[in-house]
UniProtKB/Swiss-Prot annotation:
Signal peptide: none annotated. GO terms for cellular component: cytoplasm. It is an enzyme of class 2 (transferase). GO terms for biological process: L-methionine biosynthetic process from homoserine via O-succinyl-L-homoserine and cystathionine. This is Homoserine O-acetyltransferase. It comes from Chelativorans sp. (strain BNC1). The lineage of its organism: Bacteria, Pseudomonadati, Pseudomonadota, Alphaproteobacteria, Hyphomicrobiales. PANTHER family: HOMOSERINE O-SUCCINYLTRANSFERASE. It is found in: Cytoplasm.
Length: 312
């Protein structure tokens, strides 16, 4: 089944061109099926680009998914047209009464700020608490993952001496995990962050399982069965040119930045970069959606009533 998104959403044209199965709203209404309800709290500056990246991965699932785009209510976006936000997004306050099978929280380029200095931190903590009662399975990305790890487990983030930037090798530590079905033992993933969480800071009794990590960039993917949560500290959703655009932006602005690690062929930024993580990105999101489908209650109202129910 395809992903259901608004007919006029800019991502639709991109996804159709790429061959992703997209369902129009009229067709979705005719089908006698309950689509999975997935929310995307988009904290990235370029919201159109980010919503397209996640819709691409979600839309590859054979299950019908209805994607709801969500934004912080008290934060004014500077890089996305206001009419786009009004047309396609709901504030968290507007969706708070609803239940979701899955909910994704993206990264945000604010990792060097202490959490308490983030202008929307109070709302963010309310959202994180809300996921425990209104979401069957949560998927946190990069800064979103660090914020959730801090909020739920007190795991701090640490500032790096230099930006972890490029494509780095990662270990598959849990090949039997349903989230990593089909994954290679060793894989390359994009990383772009100034901070990190450290394995030594993860409480022994936290119930967090290290699914993937890297000798160079540390923890990558944690799973928490008791809370139905995934914490992805890297940008597996990035498309082929995301790191290039970040690099070109910093070079143009005169910001000291190294060439992204193992991203360009021969580390030559004049050559087109290679995407070596695309298949694993599709696998991870497909596996997550499949797990959500198998374990979520058919009646959305039952989500949150049994907090001990967990993905296995």
């Amino acid at each position: 089944m395809p992903i259901k998104i608004p007919d006029q959403l800019p991502a639709r044209e991109v996804l159709v061109r790429e061959g992703v199965s997209v369902m129009d709203e009229k067709t979705a209404l005719r089908q006698d099926i309950r689509p999975l309800q997935i929310g995307l709290l988009n904290l990235m500056p370029n919201k159109i680009r980010t919503e397209t990246q996640f819709a691409r991965l979600i839309g590859a699932s054979p299950l019908q998914v209805e994607l709801t785009l969500v934004r912080i209510g008290n934060h004014k976006a500077k890089n996305t047209p206001e009419d786009h936000l009004i047309t396609f997004y709901e504030t968290w306050e507007e969706v708070a009464p609803r239940k979701f099978d899955g909910f994704i929280v993206t990264g945000a380029p604010i990792e060097l700020l202490p959490y308490e200095d983030v202008t929307y931190w109070n709302e963010m903590t309310r959202i994180l608490d809300w996921t425990t009662s209104h979401v069957h399975s949560s998927f946190f990305i990069c800064w979103g993952a660090m914020a959730a790890a801090w909020h739920f487990h007190g795991i701090p983030k640490h500032t790096l001496d230099k930006k972890a930037f490029g494509v780095f090798r990662h270990r598959n530590n849990a090949p039997a995990s349903p989230y990593l079905a089909g994954f290679s033992d060793d894989l390359a993933l994009p990383v772009s962050r100034w901070t990190e969480v450290r394995t030594a800071d993860i409480p022994a009794n936290s119930g967090l399982e290290m699914l993937m990590d890297s000798d160079e960039t540390g923890p990558c993917l944690l799973a928490e069965a008791a809370g139905n949560r995934l914490y992805m500290f890297n940008h597996i959703e990035y498309d082929s040119t995301s790191l290039k655009e970040e690099y070109d932006r910093d070079v143009a602005a005169g910001v000291p930045i190294e060439v992204p690690h193992e991203y360009y062929p021969g580390n030559d930024p004049t050559r087109p970069p290679l995407n070596r993580w695309r298949s694993h990105a599709h696998l991870l999101f497909g596996n997550w959606i499949n797990q959500v489908y198998q374990t979520t209650p058919y009646d959305l109202d039952k989500i949150g009533r049994n907090l001990e129910h967990a993905l296995s």
